[in-house]
């Protein structure tokens, strides 16, 4: 993969009114289905207790969620960009970026043998590379060390033949979750780490036999060995957790392992005159909770709306893009709070059960907030509905206009850190967070987030109806308007609502 895919930007060709949208990639036969986020706690040398598991199943109306097979989804988006006028330069490495009063010069060359250097002029540069960002290196933008509290390293590959956890767990039916583990993203939790099992073959229409497999763990607890290959180290971890190991009986890897050092990196600055470090070029935290594409697309939305205006008046100053900076840094900061809390809590189930609810309880209103803007835009085509999303005090928080949620998240983080430091027991920390959830008027009581015994959250259509009533009528004002307008938008969208959701 090209480590320096720095791209010069120019305005895309506008889509003609009435033009058909490109094929939606969400139902491709190489993608898996993502019906839930599933979590099972494991201890060294023991069988997992089925009572120490949590699951957030997605409402059926949202079941177009996918385990995206990235080589296909990325190819899809690349060809959409080419369709709209982007000039593709595959295997092209940027070696230098120079700025002047009139624009930017990006210099590099193709990876083909004997290729000559090339230079491209642009008005603005979006560096969407990653850890080895050319702009971060040029302007010395990296924090050293990364400013995040969270620590982890990772190893990952693709397998064939990974068994369904439902088939190897040995758990009785009455203690299993309502959605099969195999139908979603499986997180096997260990002390300060987690395995992921992400199948692409978990529905009848799949034509992809692969399964994404990985292990992410705190590198301070598990220093990276110098005398083992990643495959050998992974095998040693499997030997510690018998139920996870059974999933790999007879399975085979189909690509080489990738093994990282510490994953976390951050930047002092992500926006400047005529440039942007976008998403993974700006920083990275951890794959837990699958925030990568979501964060990227939030930044794309905020950045492109401003770029289109800049192309009209020629103002590419950092001041114009100041909100993008706050959004990028906020996305990383708030993710650090919840992921660090989660890693601390993995070894104590009650504490994890509490942190799980802080994370999960605001996914639905966060999604509703975005969908409400789409529904309103669908009705009148007014772009202001998207601009209004940015009118909040906490960019990057997944419910960004809620002071109450920010306080809940930060208090959860502080409580977990006290447990980590030995100032609280795990049960004391869990009690504090459960009381915060129970006392909070903005935490949805309908799904079961306030009920410690309800470990599997599986909202039916009827439950969604009760939730929308609560959100529209009984919830605090910051939720009421979203609930009412979301419900009204669904009614007005009629048969097209599923596409908009």
Describe each region flagged by the PLM:
Residues 256-278, 283-287:
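FAD-binding beta-loop-beta segment adjacent to the flavin cofactor pocket
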Residues 405-501:
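C-terminal non-catalytic accessory extensions
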Residues 46-70, 105, 216-220:
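Helix-loop-beta segment of a Rossmann-like dinucleotide-binding subdomain
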Residues 347-448:
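Long, charge-rich C-terminal accessory regions
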Residues 285-304:
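A conserved FAD-binding loop/helix module that cradles the flavin
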Residues 301-356, 370, 374:
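Active-site-proximal substrate-binding core of FAD-dependent oxidoreductases
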Residues 1-43:
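N-terminal FAD cofactor-binding segment of flavoenzymes
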Residues 75, 79-243, 300:
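Predominantly flavin-linked oxidoreductase catalytic cores and closely associated redox partners
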């Amino acid at each position: 993969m090209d480590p320096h895919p720095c791209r010069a930007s120019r305005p895309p060709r506008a889509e003609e009114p009435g033009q058909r949208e490109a094929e939606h990639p969400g139902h491709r036969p190489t993608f898996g289905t993502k019906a839930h986020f599933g979590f099972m706690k494991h201890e060294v040398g023991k069988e997992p207790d089925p009572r120490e598991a949590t699951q957030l199943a997605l409402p059926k109306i949202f079941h177009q969620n996918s385990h995206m097979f990235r080589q296909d989804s990325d190819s899809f988006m690349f060809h959409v960009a080419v369709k709209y006028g982007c000039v593709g330069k595959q295997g092209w490495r940027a070696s230098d970026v120079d700025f002047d009063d009139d624009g930017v010069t990006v210099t590099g060359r193709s990876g083909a043998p004997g290729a000559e250097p090339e230079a491209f002029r642009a008005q603005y540069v979006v560096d969407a590379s990653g850890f080895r960002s050319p702009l971060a290196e040029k302007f010395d933008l990296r924090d050293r060390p990364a400013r995040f509290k969270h620590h982890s390293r990772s190893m990952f590959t693709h397998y064939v033949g990974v068994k369904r956890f439902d088939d190897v767990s040995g758990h009785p039916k009455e203690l299993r979750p309502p959605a099969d583990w195999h139908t979603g993203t499986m997180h096997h939790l260990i002390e300060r780490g987690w395995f992921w099992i992400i199948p692409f073959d978990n529905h009848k229409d799949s034509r992809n036999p692969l399964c994404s497999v990985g292990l992410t763990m705190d590198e301070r607890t598990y220093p990276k060995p110098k005398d083992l290959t990643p495959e050998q180290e992974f095998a040693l971890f499997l030997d510690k957790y018998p139920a996870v190991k059974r999933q790999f009986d007879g399975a085979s890897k189909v690509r080489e392992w990738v093994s990282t050092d510490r994953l976390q990196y951050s930047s002092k600055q992500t926006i400047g005159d005529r440039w942007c470090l976008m998403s993974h070029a700006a920083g990275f935290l951890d794959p837990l909770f699958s925030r990568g594409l979501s964060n990227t697309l939030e930044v794309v939305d905020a950045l492109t709306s401003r770029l289109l205006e800049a192309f009209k008046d020629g103002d590419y100053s950092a001041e114009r893009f100041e909100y993008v900076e706050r959004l990028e840094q906020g996305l990383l900061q708030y993710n650090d709070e919840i992921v660090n809390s989660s890693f601390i809590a993995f070894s104590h189930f009650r504490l994890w059960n509490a942190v799980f609810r802080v994370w999960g309880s605001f996914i639905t209103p966060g999604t509703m907030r975005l969908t409400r803007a789409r529904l309103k835009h669908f009705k009148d085509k007014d772009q202001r509905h998207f601009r209004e999303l940015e009118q909040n005090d906490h960019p990057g928080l997944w419910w960004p206009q809620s002071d109450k949620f920010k306080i809940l998240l930060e208090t959860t983080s502080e409580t977990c850190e006290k447990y980590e430091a030995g100032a609280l027991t795990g049960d004391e920390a869990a009690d504090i967070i459960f009381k915060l959830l129970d006392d909070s008027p903005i935490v949805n009581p309908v799904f079961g987030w306030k009920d410690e015994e309800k470990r599997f959250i599986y909202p039916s259509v009827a439950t969604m109806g009760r939730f929308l009533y609560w959100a529209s009528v009984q919830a605090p004002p910051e939720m009421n308007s979203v609930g009412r307008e979301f419900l009204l938008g669904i009614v007005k969208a009629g048969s097209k609502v599923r596409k908009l959701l």
